[in-house]
Amino acid sequence: MTKFSFRYASNPSDVNKYNTNELREYFLIENLFVANEIQLTYSMYDRFIVGGIMPVGKELKLESIPYLKSEHFLDRRELGIINVGGSGTVSVDGIKY
């Protein structure tokens, strides 16, 4: 299951006035890794996406989200993967890495 959220860019003049709670509300990404879910946050800062994927005993498929306006997630994007857990496999077009 893929869950996603959207973040607007903040005005630099406004950010200078944010208190701790406001900074956390606008910039902190919580619950990035949830078992058997794909968590994505689409940010208007350079239109980048931060995501966490934690497969536990099953495969998860990275699918497009509405903000991308494309059939596949990587139609117009590149992807970097950092494994911070145990051993894992990424399958792309039937090839396992």
Feature locations, PLM:
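A short, N-terminal "cap"/entry segment at the start of jelly-roll beta-barrel domains
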Residues: 1-52
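Glycine- and acidic-residue-biased ligand/ion/polar-headgroup-sensing regions
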Residues: 42-60, 68-97
